[in-house]
Protein backbone atom coordinates (compact mmCIF):
# COMPACT_ATOMS: atom_id res chain seq x y z
CA UNK A 1 0.00 0.00 0.00
CA UNK A 2 1.33 3.42 -0.93
CA UNK A 3 2.27 5.62 1.99
CA UNK A 4 2.13 8.71 -0.21
CA UNK A 5 -1.37 7.87 -1.44
CA UNK A 6 -2.73 7.66 2.10
CA UNK A 7 -1.86 11.28 2.89
CA UNK A 8 -4.77 13.73 2.50
CA UNK A 9 -4.32 16.63 0.08
CA UNK A 10 -4.95 19.97 1.78
CA UNK A 11 -6.84 22.53 -0.32
CA UNK A 12 -5.72 26.14 0.35
CA UNK A 13 -8.15 29.06 0.34
CA UNK A 14 -8.95 30.39 -3.13
CA UNK A 15 -8.71 26.99 -4.86
CA UNK A 16 -11.85 25.54 -6.42
CA UNK A 17 -11.97 21.84 -7.35
CA UNK A 18 -14.59 20.32 -9.65
CA UNK A 19 -14.90 16.56 -10.13
CA UNK A 20 -16.11 15.68 -13.64
CA UNK A 21 -16.87 12.34 -15.27
CA UNK A 22 -13.29 11.64 -16.36
CA UNK A 23 -11.35 14.73 -15.24
CA UNK A 24 -10.67 16.82 -12.17
CA UNK A 25 -10.56 20.59 -12.74
CA UNK A 26 -8.51 22.72 -10.35
CA UNK A 27 -9.02 26.50 -10.50
CA UNK A 28 -6.79 28.84 -8.52
CA UNK A 29 -5.51 32.41 -8.51
CA UNK A 30 -2.77 31.72 -11.09
CA UNK A 31 -4.39 29.27 -13.54
CA UNK A 32 -6.83 26.45 -14.19
CA UNK A 33 -5.47 22.92 -14.59
CA UNK A 34 -7.16 19.65 -15.53
CA UNK A 35 -5.89 16.22 -14.48
CA UNK A 36 -7.41 12.86 -15.52
CA UNK A 37 -9.34 10.75 -13.05
CA UNK A 38 -8.40 7.11 -12.44
CA UNK A 39 -11.26 4.57 -12.40
CA UNK A 40 -9.34 2.35 -9.97
CA UNK A 41 -9.47 5.01 -7.24
CA UNK A 42 -12.26 6.88 -5.49
CA UNK A 43 -11.95 10.56 -4.62
CA UNK A 44 -13.57 12.01 -1.51
CA UNK A 45 -13.85 15.79 -1.06
CA UNK A 46 -14.18 16.80 2.62
CA UNK A 47 -14.21 20.52 3.52
CA UNK A 48 -10.61 21.61 2.88
CA UNK A 49 -9.02 18.29 1.88
CA UNK A 50 -9.21 15.48 -0.67
CA UNK A 51 -8.77 11.85 0.35
CA UNK A 52 -8.00 9.13 -2.20
CA UNK A 53 -8.91 5.50 -1.55
CA UNK A 54 -7.92 2.42 -3.49
CA UNK A 55 -10.95 0.46 -4.78
CA UNK A 56 -9.09 -2.71 -5.76
CA UNK A 57 -6.06 -4.54 -4.43
CA UNK A 58 -4.44 -5.05 -7.84
CA UNK A 59 -0.88 -4.13 -8.67
CA UNK A 60 -1.98 -1.47 -11.15
CA UNK A 61 -4.36 0.26 -8.73
CA UNK A 62 -1.70 0.37 -6.02
CA UNK A 63 0.75 1.88 -8.52
CA UNK A 64 -1.79 4.55 -9.50
CA UNK A 65 -2.62 5.35 -5.87
CA UNK A 66 0.52 7.35 -5.03
CA UNK A 67 0.90 8.71 -8.57
CA UNK A 68 -2.58 10.24 -8.80
CA UNK A 69 -2.30 11.76 -5.32
CA UNK A 70 1.01 13.42 -6.25
CA UNK A 71 -0.30 14.66 -9.62
CA UNK A 72 -3.33 16.20 -7.89
CA UNK A 73 -1.15 17.80 -5.18
CA UNK A 74 1.16 19.23 -7.89
CA UNK A 75 -1.84 20.76 -9.69
CA UNK A 76 -3.03 22.41 -6.47
CA UNK A 77 0.47 23.77 -5.76
CA UNK A 78 0.77 24.95 -9.37
CA UNK A 79 -2.43 27.01 -9.37
CA UNK A 80 -1.50 28.68 -6.05
CA UNK A 81 2.30 29.14 -6.02
CA UNK A 82 3.47 27.99 -9.46
CA UNK A 83 6.69 26.21 -10.41
CA UNK A 84 10.01 27.45 -11.76
CA UNK A 85 13.28 26.05 -13.07
CA UNK A 86 16.45 28.07 -13.46
CA UNK A 87 19.03 27.39 -16.16
CA UNK A 88 22.55 28.85 -16.35
CA UNK A 89 24.24 29.63 -19.66
CA UNK A 90 28.02 29.21 -19.23
CA UNK A 91 30.55 30.10 -21.91
CA UNK A 92 32.39 33.02 -23.49
CA UNK A 93 30.00 34.90 -25.77
CA UNK A 94 27.02 32.77 -24.73
CA UNK A 95 23.92 34.91 -24.21
CA UNK A 96 20.24 34.47 -23.46
CA UNK A 97 17.37 36.91 -23.95
CA UNK A 98 13.58 36.79 -23.82
CA UNK A 99 11.41 38.73 -26.27
CA UNK A 100 7.71 38.18 -25.56
CA UNK A 101 7.15 34.43 -25.63
CA UNK A 102 10.36 33.66 -27.56
CA UNK A 103 13.65 32.72 -25.90
CA UNK A 104 16.72 33.61 -27.97
CA UNK A 105 19.95 31.73 -27.26
CA UNK A 106 23.41 32.53 -28.64
CA UNK A 107 25.37 29.46 -27.62
CA UNK A 108 28.21 29.03 -30.09
CA UNK A 109 26.29 28.17 -33.25
CA UNK A 110 26.54 30.25 -36.43
CA UNK A 111 23.00 31.47 -35.80
CA UNK A 112 20.92 32.36 -32.74
CA UNK A 113 18.48 29.65 -31.62
CA UNK A 114 14.84 30.74 -31.09
CA UNK A 115 12.45 28.74 -28.91
CA UNK A 116 8.77 29.60 -28.69
CA UNK A 117 7.23 29.12 -25.25
CA UNK A 118 3.82 27.39 -25.04
CA UNK A 119 0.77 28.99 -23.41
CA UNK A 120 1.00 29.10 -19.63
CA UNK A 121 4.83 29.28 -19.58
CA UNK A 122 6.80 32.49 -19.07
CA UNK A 123 10.54 33.09 -19.00
CA UNK A 124 12.78 35.72 -17.45
CA UNK A 125 16.43 36.30 -18.37
CA UNK A 126 18.85 37.92 -15.92
CA UNK A 127 22.42 37.98 -17.20
CA UNK A 128 23.49 34.38 -17.71
CA UNK A 129 20.43 32.91 -15.94
CA UNK A 130 17.11 31.94 -17.50
CA UNK A 131 14.14 31.23 -15.24
CA UNK A 132 11.18 29.32 -16.67
CA UNK A 133 7.91 29.72 -14.74
CA UNK A 134 4.43 28.25 -15.02
CA UNK A 135 1.63 26.50 -13.19
CA UNK A 136 2.05 23.07 -14.86
CA UNK A 137 5.05 21.27 -13.33
CA UNK A 138 5.42 18.84 -16.23
CA UNK A 139 5.36 21.58 -18.87
CA UNK A 140 7.91 23.70 -16.96
CA UNK A 141 10.26 20.70 -16.69
CA UNK A 142 9.82 19.79 -20.37
CA UNK A 143 10.63 23.32 -21.54
CA UNK A 144 13.71 23.50 -19.30
CA UNK A 145 14.91 20.14 -20.66
CA UNK A 146 14.25 21.24 -24.25
CA UNK A 147 16.29 24.43 -23.78
CA UNK A 148 19.12 22.53 -22.02
CA UNK A 149 19.25 20.01 -24.89
CA UNK A 150 20.30 22.77 -27.33
CA UNK A 151 23.80 22.89 -25.80
CA UNK A 152 24.42 20.38 -23.01
CA UNK A 153 27.32 21.19 -20.69
CA UNK A 154 30.52 19.55 -21.86
CA UNK A 155 32.79 17.83 -19.30
CA UNK A 156 36.11 19.52 -20.13
CA UNK A 157 35.41 23.24 -19.68
CA UNK A 158 31.80 23.08 -18.47
CA UNK A 159 30.49 25.27 -21.31
CA UNK A 160 26.82 24.93 -22.18
CA UNK A 161 23.38 25.21 -20.61
CA UNK A 162 22.90 23.58 -17.22
CA UNK A 163 20.33 23.55 -14.43
CA UNK A 164 21.17 25.89 -11.55
CA UNK A 165 21.61 23.04 -9.05
CA UNK A 166 23.31 20.65 -11.51
CA UNK A 167 26.91 19.63 -10.84
CA UNK A 168 28.91 18.87 -13.97
CA UNK A 169 31.37 16.01 -13.68
CA UNK A 170 34.62 17.37 -15.03
CA UNK A 171 37.25 15.35 -16.90
CA UNK A 172 40.99 15.91 -17.05
CA UNK A 173 42.31 17.06 -20.41
CA UNK A 174 45.11 15.52 -22.43
CA UNK A 175 48.24 14.64 -20.52
CA UNK A 176 50.37 16.79 -22.86
CA UNK A 177 53.09 14.68 -24.44
CA UNK A 178 54.00 12.30 -21.64
CA UNK A 179 55.65 9.10 -22.78
CA UNK A 180 57.07 10.44 -26.07
CA UNK A 181 60.75 9.84 -26.76
From Swiss-Prot:
Molecular-function annotations in GO: rRNA binding; structural constituent of ribosome
GO biological process: cytoplasmic translation
KW NADP (keyword) present: no
GO cellular component: cytosolic large ribosomal subunit
Organism superkingdom: Bacteria
Pfam family, one: Ribosomal_L6
Keywords: Ribonucleoprotein, Ribosomal protein, RNA-binding, rRNA-binding
Subunit comment: Part of the 50S ribosomal subunit.
Family stated for the protein in its record: Belongs to the universal ribosomal protein uL6 family.
Protein name: Large ribosomal subunit protein uL6
Gene coding for it: rplF
Amino acid sequence: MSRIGKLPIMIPAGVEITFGEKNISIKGPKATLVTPKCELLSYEHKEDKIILTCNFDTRESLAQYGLRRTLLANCIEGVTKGFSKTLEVIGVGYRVSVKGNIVELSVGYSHPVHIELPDGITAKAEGQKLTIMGSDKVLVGEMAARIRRIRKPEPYKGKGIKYESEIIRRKAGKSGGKGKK
